Amino acid sequence: YFTLTSNWFVRAYNYYKDIDKFVIIIYLINQGLIYFRQNGVKIDYDTFYKDKTIEINKINISDISKDLGVPKESIRRKVLELEKEGTIKRIGKKIFVVRDTLYSSRATHTLTEIATILHEFNKILKKEKLVNEVYSVNEIIYAIKENFSYCWYQFNKFWFIYIGRWRVELKDLEYLAIGMVVIINAVKNKKFFPKNNMRLYHKALM
């Protein structure tokens, strides 16, 4: 899970050198997923990303600011930057996520990482005799892709809550990205061991 989290933030930063810009794009794309869910429409992965733009009607800066927990002026500035870069287009109150942006933000790596996590959970459930079968990572990826609009709506719903909680704590998602990289590297370091007395450890660092 921490690998998924760390990789997601690193990839988000690599897209625009600004995590909040990427979060705004994902937020806009998610409006399409919400529309499909509200209308009982199921879209698979390939159909969702094929030869299309996403049109978001009557969305304003205040809505994005409130939902993401980012000041309105910051959202306005970043949306203008995304528009100048050609990442999105605005016509009146409508915002269009252009095809190239949609295609480049495909959830390829994240999808594989989520499937890997679910596969590990599946093995635990099998070991505890709560399920009878263990599905491979590829089988899970296929199932998610076939039910993509529903599955990715649920993931984004969780992800925005997760991001929002960290934003309250740290104010800046770049700090979280750096912290995650440090944690992952520490855990993978065979010489790493937890400190028994964190208070004394922090005092020593000071």
Feature annotation, model-predicted:
Residues G69-K84:
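Short amphipathic alpha-helical interaction segments
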Residues D44-T47, N60, G92-T116:
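Short, cationic-aromatic polyanion-contact patches
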Residues K42-D46, Y103, F192-A204:
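Amphipathic, Lys/Arg-enriched alpha-helical "gate/interface" segment within cytosolic domains
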Residues V10-N14, I54, I61, S65-K72, ...:
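Short, charged/polar micro-motifs that form catalytic or ligand-binding hotspots
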Residues Y1-K42, Y142-F193:
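Short recognition helix of helix-turn-helix/winged-helix DNA-binding domains
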Residues E83-K94:
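A short, conserved structural fragment
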Residues D46-K66, L82, R199-M206:
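A short alpha-helical element within helix-turn-helix/winged-helix DNA-binding domains
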Residues Y103-I140, E146:
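Short, amphipathic alpha-helical interaction segments positioned at domain boundaries
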